[in-house]
Amino acid sequence: MHVMRLSIHRLRRFQTVELHPASALNLLTGDNGAGKTSVLEALHLMAYGRSFRGRVRDGLIQQGANDLEVFVEWKEGGSAAGERTRRAGLRHSGQEWTGRLDGEDVAQLGSLCAALAVVTFEPGSHVLISGGGEPRRRFLDWGLFHVEPDFLALWRRYVRALKQRNALLKQGAQPRMLDAWDHELAESGETLTSRRMRYLERLQDRLIPVADVIAPSLGLSALTFAPGWKRHEVSLADALLLARDRDRQNGYTSQGPHRADWMPHFDVLPGKDALSRGQAKLTALACLLAQAEDFAFERSEWPVIALDDLGSELDRHHQARVLHRLVSAPAQMLITATEIPPGLADAGALLHRFHVEHGQVALQAPSD
């Protein structure tokens, strides 16, 4: 898929900006603070329903404005015969998000997220590796969400059961009142876990070759999965029953896929905790690129790839390795930098450049 039009209204420093990116390589340059990241942030908002730079109240809406709007028009479909144009709009009124997809209001933003797939690497992406389990669970679920049509319904089923069980636990409900939700949680949770495990196994096969190319010094060798309970010993139904008294005391559910995690393993390092910040960023980027490749294989089309401030996140050597790998893929890429990255210096006509300055985005001629 590739974005044909991105319109941004009243987001951070932008009053009104419209961008028509090319279907291949797009580089947005400008000084620090010019607004390059905000362009990718707008695209990320549409694809994820949230910003990677904080909450709405952290300055997402332009100062003095009451709302913000983002519009995206893109083509999707793995072949010319199946290609179609999609259009989506997202608005925050200052109180809540609302969205439209192909001319219809959407009841949930998940409909927008399911329609437009964007893989984003930004300065905070290292938390995928160095942070807690939540971003890693979200990473797995994003991949499943986009390649398995029924996954969202399964995930919602589990989350609903978890919320109901936790509410009963906080109320100090009698044990028999938990039985129905324990059954629902166990049934949906076992299926959810099996899906996650299969996906991670498949992702590992794609990740190791990617990591060997962009960061061979890491020696990334495997991904291991922790399901959120001792699955090799007991079923989830039994784990919930065994933990019931403790859960009633604590007021929350301690066992299940909402506690799951996964970890990378390395031949030359003792574990993810031994990684430097730069190594964590490289590992995270390798995971994201492997996920993009898996999406492309399963869906017969690439997601949009957004790389923010690559120059400050990676040294020139690793930038060149990453971009060399990406240039060979038929994916649309939007990259921000203060100058042309070393891996794109010879891109020639393949590279479409935009300059961001004073709240405006302008297409640059090849000779600029």
From Swiss-Prot:
Binding, ATP: 30-37
Pfam families referenced in this protein's UniProt entry, alphabetically: SMC_N
PROSITE patterns: RECF_1 (PS00617), RECF_2 (PS00618)
Main location per the UniProt record: cytoplasm
Compartments it resides in: Cytoplasm
GO cellular component terms, semicolon-separated: cytoplasm
Keyword terms, alphabetized: ATP-binding, Cytoplasm, DNA damage, DNA repair, DNA replication, DNA-binding, Nucleotide-binding, SOS response
Alphabetized GO MF terms: ATP binding; single-stranded DNA binding
Entry's Gene Ontology BP terms: DNA replication; DNA synthesis involved in DNA repair; double-strand break repair; SOS response
Keyword Flavoprotein: no
Role of this protein: The RecF protein is involved in DNA metabolism; it is required for DNA replication and normal SOS inducibility. RecF binds preferentially to single-stranded, linear DNA. It also seems to bind ATP.
PANTHER family the UniProt entry points to: DNA REPLICATION AND REPAIR PROTEIN RECF
Family as reported in the entry's similarity comment: Belongs to the RecF family.
Protein name: DNA replication and repair protein RecF
Protein's gene: recF
